[in-house]
Amino acid sequence: MQLKQLELAGGGTLTVYLRDCCERMPNVLDRPLVLVVPGGGYTHVSPREGDPVALQFAAAGYHTAVLHYAVGESARDALPMRQLAQAIGLVRQHAERWNILPDKIALCGFSAGGHLALSGAVWDIPGMADQPRPNALLLAYPVVTAGEYAHRDSFVQLTGTQDIAAHQ
């Protein structure tokens, strides 16, 4: 397995795990990639939802990557979303060299990472409409409910305000 560590805008990183071709399957070189987006309430990036998950997908035959995105005060102004778009773009940019199927890139997001992954598939942020999007989503307990039942701490971290009206 090859390991690559890429720097992203705003201090984010993308850790990429590329499977090697094996003798038993010499014709299986190009593979889909699962980009794991850990949760953490936009206060931290959960270690248990990152590399361990990516390595399970790698064991199942996928190339994988883990996004370490901006959190806390740094998460404002859609920086995590821009970092996600940059990560998807880098994977597609290197797809041929890294033996990745560029039209088979999935995001696997947990909690706040699920919110970020879903946002990456449907974002409608001015200036980001043409950013790369995933081909598939796997969402595990995503933070997607706002209003009365919201995980308020995640939305406060993301928006920078305690005002509940801003979270609806």
Where are these regions (language model features)?
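Surface-exposed, flexible loop/turn segments at secondary-structure boundaries
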Residues: 22, 42, 72, 113, ...
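Catalytic nucleophile-loop/oxyanion-hole region of alpha/beta-hydrolase
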Residues: 45-47, 67-102
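N-terminal cap/lid segment of alpha/beta-hydrolase-fold proteins
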Residues: 1-29, 81, 152-153, 158, ...
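Short amphipathic alpha-helix adjacent to the substrate-entry channel of hydrolases
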Residues: 28, 47-65
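A fold-wide structural signal in alpha/beta-hydrolase
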Residues: 33, 58-68, 106, 136
